[in-house]
Amino acid sequence: MYIHPLNAWENQPEILDFIRKNAFATLYTQAEGRPWATHLPLFLEGKPKGKFVLHGHLAKANSQWKQLAQAEEVLVVFQGPHAYISSSWYTHENVPTWNYLAVHVYGKVRLIEGEELMHHLKSLVDQYETGRPNRVQVETMSPSYLEGQLRALVGFELEIIEVHASAKLSQNRDDE
């Protein structure tokens, strides 16, 4: 992603918070000369030595999971608020633009299964069910039902290698 120097977003705690709050991302891979994309929720986890990983899963029916196993690196895009900025808002001649927040994460994927996949699903459900009335918990679901669901999923852990973040918020414009 091109990032103008004025829009470079380098505050790691803010970026991590943004990823957590905008966890419905787009996962990109490349296969047979063609890009592939899947929209999915991801779960950010801190690891020792300041490392971070993203956990996610795909339907086994989605053949993109096979690309994950073979890819040297994948791209995940997180998008936040965005808005058209009309030049009519200025008192002098100006061009319209678009303001946005975006984070691109590059990483290596490792497929997960079994207990590790179950832990991922539990963490994901717990994250989104916390504070809800009638909270759903994976532990209360029947083992036979869960086993069927797990057979239909392919889980993964993405080790974050590089992050590019842009906060394009009209930093190059004045208030008039």
Where are these regions (language model features)?
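Binding-site signature for planar aromatic cofactors or substrates
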Residues: 1-176
